[in-house]
Amino acid sequence: MLKKFFLPDEFVKNIFHITPEKLKERNVKGIITDLDNTLVEWDRPNATPRLIEWFEEMKEHGIKVTIVSNNNERRVKLFSEPLGIPFIYKARKPMGKAFNRAVRNMELKKEDCVVIGDQLLTDVLGGNRNGYHTILVVPVASSDGFITRFNRQVERRILSALKRKGHIQWEE
């Protein structure tokens, strides 16, 4: 059960290790990505210049991006709108509705999309439960909001169990 729900298909150090070339090899046409601690620190209001370049590179290669966040409308809108990136706020991840809505909005199929995030309990669990290819990234910041701090404690236990069972091939 742990493996089925909590083991991501891929693990990368950060979003910048996900390139259009690698995505094209998998025939990926769409990205559903978390915002806080995946793209930028949870308390950073705007995208970094490097992240803006990453978004532009995806767009140039025809890869659509939608931000799906459990955060509130104000936070997600203030970050996403200046970039012209579609978004879904209060997504209620790991529930699947927001993931599926993002795919419909991008006019793609589930098989054409990946889910990227920094949390096992929201991003990976939600993506895996709903049949998406999942990519776990190391959190951008070492600090978290209150609820996420609790989730991280649970995640450490899950990762430890997956590692003991030989399912994890990377170093944390």
Curated annotation (Swiss-Prot):
CDD domains: HAD_BsYqeG-like. Its EC number is 3.1.3.-. InterPro entries: HAD-like_sf (IPR036412), HAD-SF_hydro_IA (IPR006439), HAD-SF_hydro_IIIA (IPR006549), HAD_sf (IPR023214), PGPP1/Gep4 (IPR010021). The keyword Hydrolase applies. It comes from the Bacteria. It holds the Pfam family Hydrolase_like. SUPFAM superfamilies: HAD-like. Keywords: Hydrolase. Transmembrane segments: none annotated. One of its GO terms (cellular component) is cytoplasm. GO terms for molecular function: phosphatase activity; phosphatidylglycerophosphatase activity. Has low dephosphorylation activity on GMP and glucose-6-phosphate. This is Probable phosphatase YqeG. It comes from Bacillus subtilis (strain 168). The lineage of its organism: Bacteria, Bacillati, Bacillota, Bacilli, Bacillales.
